[in-house]
């Protein structure tokens, strides 16, 4: 087992209200969670303050997106400075829904990564291929290109978690098999070794996202290069506790 600390992020996406999220937070606050796992919940921006004020301090909070500058005439956007002002330490960037629903480019995501790290926010940087890309055999090309743009904008890797999320497995009920996940994670680590450094390759956590459940999390967590999860739908349910404790 690696020395990398297991990391589980919950991405609530555009879900929940104060009542339902309050119940979820109560479940997390009273659950027995593995001390050897970092836990971070990605709340909708309008509930960041609420989530931070209600969640136990051992659980981190992440924004689900932000913009690439500190302030200005960018209606509807939030900045890393605002996120920090709410006591939040993390942000999710480059999620496939940002890329494919909202048309965010690799370049924009890279600029956001750079600005967030300069602002002392931790970054959960997402990468992953679409179904047609996997079927065409271009998975490596796609994820390496996405990773390169992120890497070009990182000076300090200690605040970065890489999240591999095959787009065909997000919210579809299809999961990459433990072997498929391990294969891509291992290749990503190899890319970091060749293009960044041995130290970064050995220390950066590469987490898996895509229909992770209480039922499949233990087998995925047993893979050598799977250092945790970014969980969507299941992070809104009590089974999120089982996923957090996948390595217990």
Curated annotation (Swiss-Prot):
Substrate binds at residues 11, 13. The active site is at 95 (electrophile), 165 (proton acceptor). The keyword Lipoprotein does not apply. Gene3D superfamilies: Aldolase class I. Its EC number is 5.3.1.1, 4.2.3.3. PANTHER family: TRIOSEPHOSPHATE ISOMERASE, TRIOSEPHOSPHATE ISOMERASE A. Homodimer. This is Triosephosphate isomerase A. The gene is tpi1a.
């Amino acid at each position: 087992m690696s020395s990398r600390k297991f990391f589980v992020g919950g991405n609530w996406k555009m879900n929940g209200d104060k009542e339902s999220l309050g119940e979820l937070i109560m479940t997390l606050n009273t659950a027995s969670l593995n001390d050897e796992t970092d836990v971070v919940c990605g709340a909708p921006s309008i509930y960041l303050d609420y989530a931070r004020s209600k969640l136990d301090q051992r659980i981190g909070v992440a924004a689900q997106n932000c913009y690439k500058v500190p302030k200005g005439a960018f209606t509807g956007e939030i900045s890393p400075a605002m996120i920090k002002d709410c006591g939040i330490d993390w942000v999710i960037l480059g999620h496939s829904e940002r890329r494919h629903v909202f048309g965010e480019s690799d370049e924009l995501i890279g600029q956001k990564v750079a600005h967030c790290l300069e602002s002392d926010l931790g970054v959960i940087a997402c990468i992953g291929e679409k179904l047609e890309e996997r079927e065409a055999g271009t998975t490596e090309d796609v994820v390496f290109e996405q990773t390169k743009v992120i890497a070009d904008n990182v000076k300090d890797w200690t605040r970065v978690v890489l999240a591999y999320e095959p787009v065909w497995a997000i919210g579809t009920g299809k999961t990459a098999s433990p072997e498929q996940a391990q294969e891509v994670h291992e290749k990503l680590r190899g890319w970091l070794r060749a293009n960044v450094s041995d130290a970064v390759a050995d220390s950066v956590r590469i987490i898996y996202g895509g229909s992770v459940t209480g039922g499949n999390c233990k087998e995925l967590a047993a893979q050598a290069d799977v250092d945790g999860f970014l969980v969507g739908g299941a992070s809104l349910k009590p089974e999120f506790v089982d996923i957090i404790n996948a390595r217990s």
